[in-house]
Amino acid sequence: MGEPQQVSALPIPPMQYIKEYTDENIRKSLAPKPPVPIKDSYMMFGNQFQCDDLIIRPLETQGIERLHPVQFDHKKELRKLLMSILVNFLDMLDILIRSPGSIRREEKLEDLKLLFVHMHHLINEYRPHQARETLRVMMEVQKRQRLETAERFQKHLERVVEMIQNCLASLPDDLPLPDGTVSVKTEPMDVQEPCTDHHEGPQGAAASVKEATIDKDAAMCGIIDEMT
C-alpha cells in the first residue's frame, strides 16, 4: 500500500504565480491562461466535492444521524448540545476511572464525536448570516471613512479660500514688483468701455487687463515665497 498523500492546509506561495505573470510575459502573451472552470467534481483538503453541492450540506447527505428536528431554534439546540457534551465528557471520565477497557468507552467516544459534529454543523449554518453581517459592517466603515475624508477636504478648501481672500484683501495698491519698480494702482478695465486711444482698440484693452493681472499674480507669488 502506497504512502498516504500529504495534503497541505495552506495554498501554494504566491511567488510561484507572480513570476509567471511578469510584464514581459504578459506583453509577449506568455502568461498562463486562466484554468478551465471545473464542471464536475474537485478535491479540497483531501476530500472530493461536487460543484453543485450546497455550501452547507444536510447531515443526512453526509451519512450522519440527525439529533435535532428539522424546525428548531439554533440557540436552544446549541445550549442542549453543550450540556450533552459536558454530561458525556463526565461519563467518559467515570468510565476511564472505573473500567478503562470497557466497550462503553468506545461508545462514549462515538457519542461525543456525534455531538461535536452537530455543534459544528449548527455553527456553520450561521456562516451566511455572518458573511452578510461582515459585509454590511465593512460597507458602513467604508462609507464613514469616505464621508470623513470628504469633510476634511471641504474644511481644507474653506481654509484655503479664506487665506487667499485675506491675502488679496491685504495687498496694497502700490505693491512693488519683484524687479524693484513700483506698480501703480491698477483696476480691471471694462472691455465694453471705449478706449481713449483709437489706435489700441479692443486688443490693447485686453492686453492692459492681462498685464495688470500678471502684476498682481507676481506680487502674490512674492508674498507666498516670503511666508514659506
From Swiss-Prot:
UniProt cross-references to InterPro entries, sorted A to Z: Immune_Mod/Transcr_Coactivator, Med7/Med21-like, Mediatior_Med7, Mediatior_Med7_sf
Chain coiled-coil ranges: none
GO terms assigned for molecular function: transcription coregulator activity
Subcellular location: Nucleus
GO cellular component, one term: mediator complex
Principal location: nucleus
Gene3D superfamilies: 6.10.140.200
Keywords assigned: Activator, Nucleus, Transcription, Transcription regulation
Biological process per Gene Ontology, one example term: regulation of transcription by RNA polymerase II
Family the UniProt entry places it in: Belongs to the Mediator complex subunit 7 family.
Record-linked PANTHER family: MEDIATOR OF RNA POLYMERASE II TRANSCRIPTION SUBUNIT 7, T-CELL IMMUNOGLOBULIN AND MUCIN DOMAIN CONTAINING TIM
Subunit: Component of the Mediator complex.
Function: Component of the Mediator complex, a coactivator involved in the regulated transcription of nearly all RNA polymerase II-dependent genes. Mediator functions as a bridge to convey information from gene-specific regulatory proteins to the basal RNA polymerase II transcription machinery. Mediator is recruited to promoters by direct interactions with regulatory proteins and serves as a scaffold for the assembly of a functional preinitiation complex with RNA polymerase II and the general transcription factors.
Protein name: Mediator of RNA polymerase II transcription subunit 7-A
Taxonomic lineage from the root: Eukaryota, Metazoa, Chordata, Craniata, Vertebrata
Gene encoding the protein: med7-a
